[in-house]
């Protein structure tokens, strides 16, 4: 019943990291836009940003 782990392509990661560098928090319209752009669900984007913020915080 558990969903498979998403494997992000290097192109997707470049875009996600670029966006994160610019802004650590994403508003919904931007999230919708990124989801469409990267062929990912809004949920995947949201969770990637959550995880990335935790990594950022840990590395501070």
Swiss-Prot record:
It holds the Pfam family Homeodomain. Residues 1-60 bind DNA. Its main location: nucleus. SMART domains: HOX (SM00389). Keywords: Developmental protein, DNA-binding, Homeobox, Nucleus, Transcription, Transcription regulation. It is found in: Nucleus. It comes from the Eukaryota. One of its GO terms (cellular component) is nucleus. GO terms for biological process: anterior/posterior pattern specification; embryonic skeletal system morphogenesis. The keyword Aminoacyl-tRNA synthetase does not apply. Disulfide bonds: none annotated. GO terms for molecular function: DNA-binding transcription factor activity, RNA polymerase II-specific; RNA polymerase II cis-regulatory region sequence-specific DNA binding. InterPro entries: HD, HD_metazoa, Homeobox_CS, Homeodomain-like_sf. PANTHER family: HOMEOBOX PROTEIN HOX-B3 (PTHR45664:SF11), PROTEIN ZERKNUELLT 1-RELATED (PTHR45664). Belongs to the Antp homeobox family. Sequence-specific transcription factor which is part of a developmental regulatory system that provides cells with specific positional identities on the anterior-posterior axis. This is Homeobox protein Hox-B3. The gene is hoxb3.
